[in-house]
């Protein structure tokens, strides 16, 4: 570094602390860059300090006359040192000693001064380090508290001077990371040549002139006198007010300053040994926080490298950075405090590797200790083992068998010691010989009875022990042929089951080593493999225990083989990708791909590299699918391993349930980790995540994350990551890289999965810190320095991780595992012992860190199992240190655990505690409630059931205890109280408060819901009880509204999603409480639990406007999904009948509430609020799909609304079409595209049913409307909706019963009769369509929809016959159409031209029917749709296209020219050109035009079946060969925020008049007072809802028994939706207020931060704070988890939620032709679609998409199962590109289906507001 040799004045200023009493003061000097300090001078009073200063600043003011000044400096050469170095002391005397010179030049960026002065004028001389040349990659984490305290410049760039408050008011709370300011290059001021100065300093003239400017340059470091008067002291009181203390309530403890100074004197330069006094730490925290409020542009005293690294760091953003600790904390949000990319995992300390055996661990421990360290236990064991081996060289009698039984206990310590000490002696070989002899049946037969069995059992146990010796032991056993010997024993006659179980245990331990497994699976030519022999054994007649034990071994073999196959595929991918440049080997590959995340790379380069990779990678789609399945299987096997892979205890019996029995079996995971390790699993996963082709595949990505998440849930899994630390570092980089990519692309991906990368990183880092703590305790003795710098560094890192919610949950999770919390408790106990005799502990920074971290764990971790072992010691610590605020708060959290054992009999005490504290819910006093509920969950709620698991009946006992302790009533009251607290802030759109407030709310809600779910499931499962306490559904509906309606981010995060799932599950338990054995009457139906629950939910929807949306979501979540289910395998008839019966039961119970349902449809039908429109459509479709009565009920209601609307105008006037008509028709249109709704409409408009004649009339009115569209916009809209409805009605694929190929043409006619309008209607519809074509006023969209509809009809004789009849009546229609196409042709209207020509080709002849415009080839049509027999010939078509003025040929010629002209710019028009030329030639060669023949025979359709029959025989599932993303997608399109209609109806309203009329008795003043100033009352038992005579009754009042319990109602979800894959769960996409565009806009990150609209709202209403006085910070971005499936068959239900992002859906391939075909699965109108944005303008969004597309091949099936047929027919798109009135560029981009939702890819619609 270049150092300027001239000495300059670096700093000159006066620090004042006016105070009555004299005390020690601390001040800090900061430099904007690194300086070299040569000299420090204290300027005595009255002496001029510098000639270049104005008089008011030029003179010294130091007082008193003498004092000692201690100086400390920040050593920039030790950037991560947690403390300041000591510079030295000056014994100041104004007459003799004013100059201090350090022993050597010191380079630093700051000084700390401490001394007993009231006023100090200080000059610092030295030189500036001109070059900053550090280029470290990663900055050190901010250091933990330094000993010398250091106030800093605050808000107004002034250093507040401390006043005379006693400084011993500080307590060592950990510091907060400081905000960094920009660095400025230094420009040092010159020194002044004052006559007082004994040294003459070089001064140059030009520098002298520079004085003012340069003095200014350093000015910010000293107090700025102009901005703030000198009196703005840096006082202790000030600090207490300004400083956001850690968690808000740190008590300040006494500090003995003198003692601390003495110690400082003793040890001037040792960083570590200066006791880290509380005050410094607390002060620093204060300064940092104040700095956060107003940074002066310079960073805190710290290493100069940090600034550089900060700039590099800014590219990384946490997905949701909310640092919300306590009220004061909000003032100081730390910047990038803890860069996770900065820290990598290091080799594992303290803990042992999870896949090593006890023997291997013992050997490595002995090696580490060294051979000289005596280990008495090992020596004794080795001596005894040697004696036994020597004693019985030959003897094989009873004593030898006894020796065999003793040996296993000596192997771990004894054999390990022998192998290390005495390498010559082959003890292992001798033991293997003995083992083989012990297992030898011949030797056993020679033993007396009983001894022979003992010998064989001892032999098997010895195998198990020797297999534990790792590779050497297993290798020797295998060479001795142990597998064959064990099989001999298993296959031998008359061997008891218990002996076979022992043999299996031995075999299991052999294959638990990879060498053993390899040998077991290997077969030679002349003998079978162990696997084959084991299968043969199981297939013999064996007892159930033996089969169970054998199956466990088979499962292990399967797992091993799956891993081998994954490794093979991974190696294959690695080889293939290495062909790409820079990808020569897997590791390089990983790095190269990770590198590419660097924004410096050009996008083109990235794209081309990816393409290279894709092209060169020969991994097929099939192999990727296989890889996905293998990874999913790995996850499944690991999840079920404890129940399927362990050897059963000898004394247990595999029953379905158990009450008591042996404790849980062995732990299977070490073996699985060994297999994973030997197959380099983490390296393979990293490779998969680093290669575009696999990392972009949702299946692979999701399956990988599932496995990694599962591993990270347990201590052993995390240790596995740590033991493979190099692979884990790369893996986390790869995961974070994927997340970063999505951030760059603006993808709205699933928050939970994004956060998973960070969560995994934080979890492993936390565990690493814990290992460092434990190993520190191992190394250090009690006498060593307590606040060791390493220890503080570790604790500080842990503390920094807790600053973001993901990190906080990770810390809580890891500390709650195993005995990890002991690391903090050890620290706290050590200091509290010290505290007995002295005050060190209260000053110890480490102690305070430990207290804070323990408190964070208690608050955020729901894993309370660890509290069982630690609660007593923690409570003791809290009692011991009553001055520590953190510990006192912890004491409140742990209050319910006093003298508590986590057993079933603690339930009454805990419930009693909850009852007593219910009024303190969500207050500081009531935090123990959360813990009590968590413990209750732990004790009383069974874990989710896993396949193969025995049911433990202790959970039933726990539920009985809950009921007897009045648990039901208590939990309902908890929910009611929680609702009353949350309602007010929610109404004002205040979020949930700080992190702590939010964690508490979520935790309390989840625990209470879990407990209620457990109790109700157990109670209602058999149908023998009814539960009529309607407080439960009522409280749940409110809770759902408060926590799960619409978050600001537009989607639920994982916690909210789980709460929603729990609420749905609890409400669904009410459907179980129906006893099928009882006779069902209207009365019993209306009063059973199911109906009462439904009534509560339905009535809540319309109760208050704030509950509209939430109520609709809730209802949609409860209803079954529409059929058919999509699946890859045939569903059993029994399951199908369950699915249909469930829907009938729902229909019956809903029919009782018909009035409510009609009211809901009527109320919302006219809404302009799009999310509510969307939800209403969704619910109507679900209701119609249940059964015919509900379908008719809903469709009647909708049609009645249309009838009322159209008939409301008086007779003589022309009908007025309003926007309300438009909305009603839009609703009908959306519903008509769904099978059940369409058939109900057809049923009603036929007019055959008495009383429904009005619907037939209104249908005719609608047809008349289409014929005369008129020119008003509203009327045009209505016409377009009606044509779209006609299209749905004429589509024979929208049908309940899908045709099966095996049933032939007869079934085709039936299909048509059941899915198309009757003859009379069809005639009217065809006439209407042709009249529309002939009408010159028809809009472009109408024409396109009509042509498409005619194409549907032309597919079969029935439709074509009616079309021909209409063409005879309206012969000019096709000519008008062609003329219109030619006259308006442009690139944008190409779609209409293409469709029209396709239609003409289609009707020309039967064999050309399959031809499509985009490929102009003939297509064979197979299966369900028989060839059409009827057609037109070319001459007839020519006649139809002719007019007096011009011939068809001339029109085609003109069209050809136009297309040719446009196709130069647009290649996509080429196929249209071919079409035009082909038709022109056909017509030219056809000869003279002929009139249409009327010889056709009218096809007669059979009478349609009744609606009820159609529902009974409907297709229940659709088969697909691959469960692709389209099938996995949610059944309904997510609502898109982009579809907001800007022309919403505006209605004039006089609000004052309205309020006087409706709310005359409303007292606004008192209401506001009640809302803002009063506490919500507790829902005690005295306040009951009207209608419930609760009084003092318990919940039993509402439980009645019908005495029969055999029947178990299958009324759960009877539909299967596989667990969705993919990253998104997605959002309704809009904020709380649906049409508030400002709210929907994300904050713009491309400009300096401005306030978001919700921040303004929050600012206006900031008096409203959550109950414990914590002001709401900025709402964190949400994290979320993938939704679990909602299938009834899988037994696993998740919510599908109303918030789904686009990426659930498979994006259909772009159309090759001029317009897309109908994409998706034929016959399934639930497949959704994503079309690229930007090509078209669609304003009628939010409805279901049901485009169809290329279809999988057929298979013969029963009538209930349907496999789609490949009819790539003519264009099947739905309607136009959106109504013409809304579309500026109608026609561009091709029709993308009927209701195209905006947004392509995953949730990219966000961009419309941000870019």
From Swiss-Prot:
Residues 224-233, 1722-1747 have a biased composition (Polar residues). The modification Phosphothreonine is found at residues 184, 1707. Component of the WMM complex, a N6-methyltransferase complex composed of a catalytic subcomplex, named MAC, and of an associated subcomplex, named MACOM. The MAC subcomplex is composed of METTL3 and METTL14. The MACOM subcomplex is composed of WTAP, ZC3H13, CBLL1/HAKAI, VIRMA, and, in some cases of RBM15 (RBM15 or RBM15B). Interacts with WTAP. Also a component of a MACOM-like complex, named WTAP complex, composed of WTAP, ZC3H13, CBLL1, VIRMA, RBM15, BCLAF1 and THRAP3. Interacts with NUDT21 and CPSF6. The keyword Nucleus applies. Associated component of the WMM complex, a complex that mediates N6-methyladenosine (m6A) methylation of RNAs, a modification that plays a role in the efficiency of mRNA splicing and RNA processing. Acts as a key regulator of m6A methylation by promoting m6A methylation of mRNAs in the 3'-UTR near the stop codon: recruits the catalytic core components METTL3 and METTL14, thereby guiding m6A methylation at specific sites. This is Protein virilizer homolog. The modification N-acetylalanine is found at residue 2. Residues 1688-1697, 1787-1801 have a biased composition (Gly residues). One of its GO terms (cellular component) is cytoplasm. Disulfide bonds: none annotated. The modification Asymmetric dimethylarginine is found at residues 1740, 1772, 1774, 1792. Residues 234-267, 274-302 have a biased composition (Acidic residues). It is found in: Nucleus speckle; Nucleus, Nucleoplasm; Cytoplasm.
């Amino acid at each position: 570094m270049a150092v300027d040799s001239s000495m300059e004045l670096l700093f000159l200023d006066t620090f004042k602390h006016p105070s009555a009493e004299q005390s020690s003061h601390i001040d800090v000097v900061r430099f904007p860059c690194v300086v070299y300090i040569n000299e420090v001078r204290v300027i005595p009073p009255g002496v001029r300090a510098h000639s270049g200063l104005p008089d008011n600043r030029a003179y010294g003011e130091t007082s008193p006359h003498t004092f000692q000044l201690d100086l400390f400096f920040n050593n920039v050469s030790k950037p991560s040192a947690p403390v300041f170095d000591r510079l030295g002391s000056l014994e100041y005397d104004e007459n003799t000693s004013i100059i201090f010179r350090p022993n050597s030049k010191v380079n630093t960026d700051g000084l700390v001064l401490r001394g007993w002065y009231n006023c100090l004028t200080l000059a610092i001389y030295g030189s500036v380090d001109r070059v900053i040349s550090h280029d470290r990659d990663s900055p050190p984490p901010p250091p933990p508290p330094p000993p010398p305290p250091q106030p800093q410049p605050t808000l107004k760039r002034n250093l507040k001077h401390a006043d005379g408050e006693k400084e011993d008011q500080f307590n060592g709370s950990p510091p907060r990371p400081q905000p960094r300011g920009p660095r400025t290059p230094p420009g040092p001021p010159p020194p002044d040549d004052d006559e007082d100065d004994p040294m003459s300093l070089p001064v140059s003239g030009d520098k002298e002139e520079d004085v003012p400017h340069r003095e200014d340059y350093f000015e910010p470091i000293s107090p700025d006198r102009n901005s703030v008067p000198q009196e703005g002291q840096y006082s202790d009181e000030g600090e207490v007010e300004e400083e956001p203390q850690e968690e808000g309530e740190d008590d300040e403890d006494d500090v003995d300053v003198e003692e601390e100074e003495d110690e400082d004197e003793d040890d001037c330069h040792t960083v570590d040994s200066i006791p880290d006094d509380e005050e410094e730490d607390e002060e620093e925290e204060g300064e940092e926080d104040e700095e956060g409020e107003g940074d002066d542009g310079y960073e805190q005293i710290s290493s100069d490298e940090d600034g550089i690294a900060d700039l590099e760091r800014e590219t990384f953003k946490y997905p949701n950075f909310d640092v919300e600790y306590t009220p004061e904390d909000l003032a100081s949000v730390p910047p990038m405090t803890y860069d996770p990319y900065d820290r990598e995992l290091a080799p594992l300390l303290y803990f042992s590797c999870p896949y090593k055996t006890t023997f291997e661990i013992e050997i490595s421990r002995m090696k580490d200790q060294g051979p000289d360290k005596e280990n008495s236990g090992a020596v004794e064991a080795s001596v005894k083992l040697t004696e036994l081996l020597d004693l019985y060289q030959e003897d094989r009698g009873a004593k030898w068998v006894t020796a065999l039984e003793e040996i296993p206990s000596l192997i771990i310590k004894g054999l390990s010691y022998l192998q290390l000490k005495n390498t010559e002696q082959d003890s292992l070989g001798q033991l293997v010989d003995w083992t083989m002899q012990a297992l030898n049946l011949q030797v056993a037969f020679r033993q007396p009875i009983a001894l022979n069995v003992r010998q064989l059992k001892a032999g098997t146990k010895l195998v198990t022990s020797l297999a534990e010796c790792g590779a050497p032991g297993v290798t020797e056993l295998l060479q001795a042929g142990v597998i064959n010997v064990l099989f001999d024993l298993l296959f031998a006659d008359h061997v008891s089951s218990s002996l076979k179980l022992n043999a299996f245990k031995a075999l299991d331990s052999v294959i638990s080593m990879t060498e053993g497994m390899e040998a077991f699976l290997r077969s030679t030519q002349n003998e079978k493999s162990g696997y084959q022999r084991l299968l043969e054994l199981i297939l013999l007649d064996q007892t159930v225990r033996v089969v169970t034990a054998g199956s466990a071994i088979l499962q292990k073999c399967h797992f091993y083989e799956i891993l081998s196959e994954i490794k093979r595929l991974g190696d294959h991918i690695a080889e293939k990708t290495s062909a790409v440049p820079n990808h020569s080997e897997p590791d390089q590959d990983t790095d190269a791909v990770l590198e590419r995340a660097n924004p410096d790379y050009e996008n083109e380069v990235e794209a081309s590299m990816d393409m290279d990779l894709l092209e060169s990678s020969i991994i097929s789609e099939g192999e990727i699918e296989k890889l996905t399945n293998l990874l999913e299987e790995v996850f499944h096997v690991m999840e079920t391993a404890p129940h399927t892979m362990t050897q059963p205890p000898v004394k247990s019996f595999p029953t379905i349930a158990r009450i008591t029995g042996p404790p849980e079996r062995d732990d299977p995971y070490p073996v699985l980790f060994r297999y994973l390790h030997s197959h380099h699993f983490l390296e393979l996963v990293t490779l998969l995540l680093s290669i575009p082709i696999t990392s972009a595949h949702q299946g692979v990505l999701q399956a990988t994350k599932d496995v990694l998440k599962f591993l990270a849930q347990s201590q052993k899994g995390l240790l596995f990551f740590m033991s493979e630390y190099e692979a884990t570092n790369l893996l986390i980089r790869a995961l974070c890289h994927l997340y970063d990519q999505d951030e760059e692309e603006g993808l709205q991906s699933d928050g939970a999965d994004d956060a998973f990368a960070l969560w995994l990183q934080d979890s492993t880092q936390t565990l690493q810190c814990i290992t460092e703590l434990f190993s520190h305790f191992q190394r250090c003795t009690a006498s060593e320095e307590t606040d060791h710098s390493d220890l503080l560094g570790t604790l500080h890192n842990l503390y920094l991780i807790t600053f973001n919610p993901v990190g906080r949950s990770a810390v809580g999770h890891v500390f709650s595992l195993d005995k990890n919390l002991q690391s903090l408790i050890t620290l706290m106990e050590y200091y509290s012992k010290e505290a007995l005799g002295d005050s060190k502990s209260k000053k110890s920074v480490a102690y305070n860190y430990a207290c804070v971290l323990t408190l964070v764990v208690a608050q955020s971790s729901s894993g309370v199992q660890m509290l069982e072992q630690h609660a007593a010691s923690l409570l003791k610590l809290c009692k011991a240190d009553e001055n520590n605020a953190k510990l006192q708060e912890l004491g409140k959290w742990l209050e319910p655990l006093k003298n508590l054992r986590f057993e079933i009999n603690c339930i009454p005490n805990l419930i009693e505690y909850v009852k007593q504290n219910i009024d303190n819910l969500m207050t500081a006093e009531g935090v123990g409630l959360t813990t009590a509920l968590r413990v209750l969950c732990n004790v009383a709620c069974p874990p989710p059931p896993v396949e193969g698991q025995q049911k433990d009946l202790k959970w039933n006992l726990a539920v009985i205890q809950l009921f007897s302790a009045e648990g039901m009533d208590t939990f309902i009251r908890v929910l009611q109280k929680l609702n009353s607290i949350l309602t007010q802030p929610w109404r004002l759109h205040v979020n949930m408060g700080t992190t702590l407030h939010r964690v508490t709310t979520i935790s309390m809600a989840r625990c209470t819901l879990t407990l209620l779910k457990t109790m109700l499931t157990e109670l209602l499962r058999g149908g023998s009880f009814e539960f009529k306490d309607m407080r439960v559904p009522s409280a749940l509906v409110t809770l759902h509204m408060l926590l799960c309606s619409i978050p600001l981010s537009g989607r639920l995060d994982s916690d909210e999603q789980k709460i929603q799932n729990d609420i749905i599950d609890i409400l669904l338990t009410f459907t179980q409480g129906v006893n099928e054995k009882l006779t069902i009457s209207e009365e019993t139906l209306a009063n059973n639990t199911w109906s009462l629950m439904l009534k509560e939910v339905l009535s809540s929807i319309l109760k208050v406007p704030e509950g509209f949306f939430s109520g609709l979501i809730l209802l949609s979540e409860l209803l079954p999904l529409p059929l058919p289910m999509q699946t890859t395998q045939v569903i059993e008839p029994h399951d199908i009948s369950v699915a249909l019966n469930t829907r009938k039961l729902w229909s019956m119970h809903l029919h009782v509430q018909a009035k409510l349902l009609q009211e809901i449809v009527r109320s919302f039908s006219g809404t302009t609020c799009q999310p509510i429109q969307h939800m209403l459509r969704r619910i109507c479709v679900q209701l119609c799909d249940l059964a015919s009565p509900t379908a008719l009920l809903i469709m009647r209601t909708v049609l009645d609304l249309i009838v009322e609307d159209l008939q409301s105008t008086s007779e003589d006037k022309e009908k007025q079409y309003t926007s309300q008509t438009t909305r009603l028709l839009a609703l009908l249109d959306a519903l008509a595209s769904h099978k059940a709704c369409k058939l109900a409409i057809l049923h009603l408009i036929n007019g055959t049913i008495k009383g429904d004649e009005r619907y037939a009339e209104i249908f005719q009115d609608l047809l008349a409307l289409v014929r005369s569209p008129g020119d008003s916009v509203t009327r045009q809209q209505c016409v377009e909706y009606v044509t779209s409805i006609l299209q749905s009605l004429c589509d024979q694929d929208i049908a309940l019963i899908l045709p099966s190929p095996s049933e032939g043409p007869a079934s085709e006619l039936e299909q048509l009769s059941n899915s198309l309008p009757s003859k009379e209607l069809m005639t009217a519809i065809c006439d209407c369509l042709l009249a529309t074509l002939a009408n010159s006023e028809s809009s472009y969209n109408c024409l396109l929809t009509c042509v498409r509809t005619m194409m549907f009809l032309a597919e079969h004789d029935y439709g074509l016959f009616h079309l021909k009849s209409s063409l005879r009546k309206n012969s000019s229609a096709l000519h008008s159409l062609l003329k219109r196409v030619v006259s308006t042709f442009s690139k944008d209207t190409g779609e209409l031209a293409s469709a029209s020509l396709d239609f003409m080709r289609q009707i020309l002849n039967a064999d050309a029917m399959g031809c499509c415009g985009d490929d102009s080839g003939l297509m064979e049509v197979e299966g369900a749709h028989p060839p059409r027999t009827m057609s037109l010939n070319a001459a007839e078509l020519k006649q139809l296209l002719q007019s007096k003025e011009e011939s068809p040929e001339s029109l085609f010629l003109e069209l050809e020219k136009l297309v040719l002209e446009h196709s130069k710019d647009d290649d996509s028009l080429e196929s249209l050109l071919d079409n035009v030329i082909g038709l022109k030639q056909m017509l030219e060669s056809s000869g003279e035009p002929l009139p249409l023949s009327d010889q056709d025979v009218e096809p007669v359709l059979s009478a349609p079946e009744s609606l009820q029959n159609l529902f009974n025989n409907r297709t229940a599932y659709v088969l697909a060969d691959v469960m692709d993303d389209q099938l996995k997608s949610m059944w309904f399109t997510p609502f898109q925020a982009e579809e907001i209609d800007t022309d919403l109806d505006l209605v004039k309203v006089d609000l004052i008049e309205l309020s006087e009329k409706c709310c005359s008795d409303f007292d606004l003043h008192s209401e506001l007072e009640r809302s803002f100033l009063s506490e919500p009352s507790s829902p005690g038992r005295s306040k009951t809802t009207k209608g419930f005579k609760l009084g003092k009754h318990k919940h039993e009042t509402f439980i009645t028994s019908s005495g029969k319990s055999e029947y178990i109602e299958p009324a759960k979800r009877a539909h299967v939706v596989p667990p969705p894959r993919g990253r998104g769960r997605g959002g309704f996409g809009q904020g709380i207020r649906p049409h508030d565009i400002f709210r929907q806009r994300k904050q713009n990150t491309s400009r300096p931060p401005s306030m978001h609209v919700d921040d303004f709202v929050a600012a206006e209403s900031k008096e409203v704070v959550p109950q414990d006085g914590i002001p709401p910070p900025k709402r964190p971005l949400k994290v979320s988890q993938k939704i679990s499936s909602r299938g009834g068959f899988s037994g696993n239900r998740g919510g599908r939620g109303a918030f789904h992002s686009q990426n659930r859906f498979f994006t259909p391939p772009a159309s090759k032709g001029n317009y897309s075909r109908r994409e998706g699965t034929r016959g399934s109108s639930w497949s959704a679609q994503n079309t690229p944005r930007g090509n078209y303008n669609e304003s009628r969004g939010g409805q279901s998409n049901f485009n169809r597309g290329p279809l999988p091949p057929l298979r013969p099936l029963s009538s209930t199962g349907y496999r789609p047929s490949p009819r790539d027919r003519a264009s099947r798109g739905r309607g136009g590109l959106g109504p013409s009135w809304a579309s500026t560029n109608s026609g561009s981009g091709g029709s993308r289906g009927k209701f195209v939702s905006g947004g392509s890819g995953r949730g990219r619609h966000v961009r419309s507001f941000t870019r």
